[in-house]
Regions:
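Cytosolic signal-transmission helices at domain junctions
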Residues: 1-5
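Cytosolic nucleotide-binding catalytic cores of signal-transduction proteins
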Residues: 36-131
Length: 131
């Protein structure tokens, strides 16, 4: 669940902090742990699928509706919208995707427009969760 995964991450970071606090390598160890978690969101398909499952569970199966309604979207488009639905900031998404913050906003706007102009009966449900 979202609750368990959030606290699991905090637990990992806290353990790393506890084990390295006061040493020369404490900042490096925390940085490495954070970098490892970010890399999961960049490349680990299982981890990304878990995020999508959480979004579906808490946001009315919006990712399922999106995938069914907009099959022409690329996997990166789906992933961007999943990150947005999950509540990540443009800066965080920029780190996950390697794209600039400006491009994140531009892609988000372009995708919203495509969804709004689509003939999908689910377009309002899909757009509801995009701020």
């Amino acid at each position: 669940t979202l609750f368990a995964s959030q606290f699991s991450l905090i637990d990992k970071l806290t353990n790393t902090y506890y084990e390295t606090h006061g040493t020369k390598r404490d900042k490096e160890a925390i940085y490495t742990q954070v970098r490892n978690e970010i890399e999961k969101l960049q490349t680990n398909k299982r981890y990304i699928q878990q995020l999508e499952d959480i979004v579906n569970k808490h946001k009315g199966n919006v990712m399922q509706l999106l995938r069914e309604s907009m099959p022409e979207f690329s996997e990166m488009d789906h992933r961007l919208l999943c990150f947005i639905y999950a509540g990540f900031s443009a800066k965080a998404i920029s780190v996950f995707t390697g794209d600039s913050v400006g491009n994140i906003y531009m892609r988000k706007s372009r995708l919203k427009a495509k969804i709004a102009q689509s003939n999908s009966e689910n377009r309002e449900d899909i757009l509801r969760y995009i701020p």
